[in-house]
Amino acid sequence: MIEPLSKIPGGMRYYSGAEARLRRGVEDRIMAVFDGWSYDEITTPCVDYLALFERGMGYEEAHRAFRFTDSDGLMLALRPDVTSSVARAAATLFAERPRPLRFCYASPVFHQRQRTHAEWRRENKHLGGELIGVAGRAAEIETLSVAIEILTALSLRRDCRITVNSVEIFSGISEHLSLDALQRERMRQLVDTRDAAELQKFLSDFATTETERVSFARLMRLSGKGEILDGARRIITNPRSLAALDELESLWRIVEALDMADCCDIDLGDVSGLDYYTGLTFKIYVAGAGTRVGGGGRYDNLTGNFGRPEPAVGFVLDLDALTDLLMRRGSSTSDAGSGTDACTLLNSEATEPATLFMDARRRRAGNERVLINYRG
């Protein structure tokens, strides 16, 4: 049956009037913050090879894209993700550019999703930032600092919750239990959906003792501030997960020193579904949004798909989720205006991360443009 042309395809939207103005204002405000941290805007192709997204997002996520074949018989997809394309650009187009690279974007992404609720969408606009070519805590703190400044600029800091975790904790446990890829994914789904009963049942086939089975199930439900890390260490014995806990504790100490712990939590059950994350992950929630409004993490292996492996960390915000929330609150966001080319260079090598980012945030509060120099 052919749908009448007076309708639009399911999951698509028109925007006009106050809603369109709000969307433009929110986007401008977010991009102004990225500019203030010296991120360069990049636009990636709307149509790309399906294989690009299979490598970046994983097969299952990539195959939720709108797929089609071009005249040469090549399988293409409407872009379901931006990070994979930015990583390729870093490894190819910008291979000779001095590191680190900082990119930001405001781009629509498309997914074939099942209808689940009234606000179901198959097109979303993603606004994100990528910091490529820097390992270590300072780069991760920069990413979190930018995200929190954006939420503050949108008057959402008081109502936001950012959960941090490391995929290496989960990976170490999976390795300890000798899970294959399918079993690992099944356990990830059970952890992500907080299905405690099914998780314990699943673990009964792999845990060596009843105590281990119950302990691992409890571990995956641990969330809170830094004190939960001690509880996790009483359960975990494998070196890979213990090393990840040490790294998470190091990050958390800086989060506390920067007074960001009020809007951050550690959540060992917040397990990402994207294949490209390699260490830190975080998800962004705002009270009243009904779903997470963003997330990100470290993806050190992704650029290696294109011949240049290097560390990278980034995050994305969902413009639709943010503006839906702000519309319900009756918010209006005026244009943020353009940034300035003047820039204050801050040297990461000479300063502890907490002190470095205290200085950076103080300058950003005065609307200065800052650039963290990781090269010394």
Label each region the model flagged:
Residues 44-63, 164-175, 270-278:
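Beta-rich nucleic-acid/ligand-interaction surfaces
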Residues 2, 19-37, 49, 83-96, ...:
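Positively charged, Gly/Ser-enriched RNA/tRNA-binding surfaces
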Residues 75, 161-162, 314:
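A residue-level structural signature of the nucleotidyltransferase/glycosyltransferase Rossmann-like core
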Residues 60-61, 179-180, 333:
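Short, hinge-like loop/turn segments at secondary-structure boundaries
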Residues 41-44, 105, 161-165, 265-267:
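A structural signal for short, well-ordered beta-strand segments and their strand-loop junctions
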Residues 1-84, 141:
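TRNA-binding/sensing appendages of the translation machinery
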Residues 154-157, 161, 167-171, 183, ...:
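Extended alpha-helical scaffolds
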